[in-house]
Amino acid sequence: MELLHSINDFNEAKQVIVGGVNSPVRAFKSVKGTPPFILKGKGAYLYDVDNNHYIDFVQSWGPLIFGHADEEIEENIIKALKKGTSFGAPTELETTLAKEIISCYDGLDKVRLVNSGTEATMSAIRLARAYSQKDDLIKFEGCYHGHSDSLLVKAGSGCTTFGSPSSLGVPSDFSKHTLVARYNDLNSVQECFQKGNVGCVIIEPIAGNMGLVPAQKEFLVGLKALCEKYQAVLILDEVMSGFRASLSGSQEFYGVVPDLVTFGKVIGAGLPLACFGGRAEIMDLLSPIGGVYQAGTLSGNPLAVCAGLSTLYKIKRDKTLYSRLNALAIRLTQGLKKSAKSYNIALQTLNRGSMFGFFFNENAVCDFDDALKSNTEMFAKFHQKMLFKGVYLACSSFETGFICEPMTEEMIDLVIVKANESFDEIIKGV
């Protein structure tokens, strides 16, 4: 496999786009490689400008549960496109999508559509602070909630990939209201509550930005109880896990009903769409009926809303979708672990529905500190080997992988064969 055209494209891009990419992780810096420049995607596959094709386990970082260029979703987007790209006015489709989202998640009375996960979490926190009338928030080490200033503290994902727990340019006045607790550790949460005037707590119930690290059930249930005790708003960030891990996101696994929740990725099917929602008494503080301001020129964009509706309709029709995706994720993770074990390579694997992760680590990963102990050099070698064998994995050990509906058992088995070849070459130093 060659990447000559991608190398040239990357060099050209770096002249006019900062770092050559429009989101840092795409630069392949942590795996010391050149990112393939993508020409198109179809189903489970990506095709690059060098005529290489890859089985894609990134799926645009999660949104594409039905794979690339799904015909039904594509056709509905084209129909919507012919009616106009944006109106800046209400449409019936927005209401329909809101009803579909609400019907899937307990405790959700009303939602507000926005353009990105960052907007959703930022707005949810503003709303929670207004409701609680308290300024401090608790977040967790390794959880990523977008790139708004107060949340870029020990944020996992891209920040960790580039060796920094936070971001430059965040004023201390912002970060001083952010208390950071240890994931899966209720004692550290209790300490944070005792330190500050905490108005809200935000967490990924299935963390996907320090690698895949699910919350322990007793931890999440206990967190809800602490929020009730201290009268703090609990925000579950399900931008990644919502409609991915299951139809009801994390609730399938934990049964925890938050005060507010954020969704993104799958509900936009690859177009810019996210939302936040929760109890009516909190949501009704939003403008235009309340005093919490939030707005967006392209919020509820008809193309994105149409893509989201098409996706949710298709999900709901397919009664065995999540069980099939879960089975494929288990087949993949168990196969990878078995292959690594045969070469005496320490590998931890796990999945939640169609989300999966693996760590080159001796022990199970339960929090951010555990994730940081992983062998990132081994990951970089493995990633490079797999890429050149036609397997497109997330280019950081602190990211999550995704199964999509067009994938088959035969594809997964082929990937395991290629993983076996890769481990063999790594051990032999080839």
Swiss-Prot record:
It is found in: Cytoplasm. The keyword Transmembrane does not apply. The modification N6-(pyridoxal phosphate)lysine is found at residue 265. One of its GO terms (molecular function) is transaminase activity. GO terms for biological process: protoporphyrinogen IX biosynthetic process. Belongs to the class-III pyridoxal-phosphate-dependent aminotransferase family. HemL subfamily. This is Glutamate-1-semialdehyde 2,1-aminomutase. It comes from Helicobacter acinonychis (strain Sheeba).
